[in-house]
């Protein structure tokens, strides 16, 4: 069994997703569009598809984004699981006909998200469904719900934080982060964040980094449960 991972930016690699897959003996291939990798022509040899984040908008005129959407629809038609992190989640929404647009407010840094109750949420979140969890955000856009999708996570800043549909989970938040990835983001994003001082839902780099010790473990615990379901679906 192999998983295809689509990477949109060289600074936004698989991180904890790759660590988790390796730990559980799951093979995967990473297609880094930022390094001019071509996407897989088909998902025929893959059991599932994972999409990572990136600084671009789903609405940008980039061939890699349209190719990603095509692969998402192929996975849907084949009943294969798909998981999307931030831009990856927005690509799922767009591929399924939902609107992706600039959010009312950027959301950057550590936040709380409320995981829904119900069977779809429980499938992905298990015992965490119905509770608040820590999550790392870094997004300017937001998605609406595609037809037939179920809202499974939200908060006051971004009411649609995640949805489930067709063996797919689309998330605005970043469960794939690890310490190294987030520390690099905080370090490299200082100027970006400084330009957003005064925005009510944007943490500055120092605050993001300072909260890693107390927040990362909870993020990984949620990621563990989500990735377990992703691979469970890939094996069926």
Task: Report residues per predicted region.
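Short, glycine/charged-enriched secondary-structure capping and boundary segments
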Residues: 18-20, 46, 63-66, 97-100, ...
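N-terminal beta1-alpha1 cap of cysteine-dependent amidohydrolase-like domains
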Residues: 1-80, 197-236
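C-terminal helical/coil "lid" or tail adjacent to the Rossmann-like core of SAM-dependent
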Residues: 166, 175-212
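Pocket-forming structural segment of enzyme catalytic cores
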Residues: 96-181
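Catalytic nucleophile loop
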Residues: 74-99
């Amino acid at each position: 069994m192999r998983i295809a991972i689509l990477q949109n930016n060289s600074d936004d690699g698989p991180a904890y997703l790759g660590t988790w897959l390796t730990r559980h003996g799951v093979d995967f291939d990473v297609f880094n569009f930022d390094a001019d990798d071509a996407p897989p022509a088909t998902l025929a040899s893959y059991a599932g598809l994972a999409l990572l984040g990136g600084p671009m908008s789903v609405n940008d005129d980039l061939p890699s984004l349209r190719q990603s959407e095509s692969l998402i629809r192929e996975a849907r038609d084949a009943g294969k699981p798909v998981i999307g992190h931030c831009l990856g989640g927005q690509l799922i929404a767009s591929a399924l006909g939902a609107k992706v647009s600039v959010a009312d407010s950027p959301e950057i840094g550590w936040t709380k998200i409320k995981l829904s109750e119900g069977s779809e949420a429980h499938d992905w979140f298990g015992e965490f469904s119905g509770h608040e969890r820590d999550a790392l955000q870094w997004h300017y856009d937001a998605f609406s719900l595609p037809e037939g999708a179920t809202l499974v996570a939200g908060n006051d800043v971004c009411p649609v934080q995640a949805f489930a549909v067709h063996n797919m989970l689309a998330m605005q938040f970043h469960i794939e982060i690890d310490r190294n990835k987030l520390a690099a983001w905080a370090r490299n994003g200082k100027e970006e964040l400084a330009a957003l001082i005064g925005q009510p839902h944007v943490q500055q780099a120092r605050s993001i980094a300072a909260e890693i010790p107390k927040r990362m473990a909870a993020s990984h615990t949620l990621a563990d449960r989500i990735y377990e379901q992703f691979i469970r679906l890939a094996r069926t």
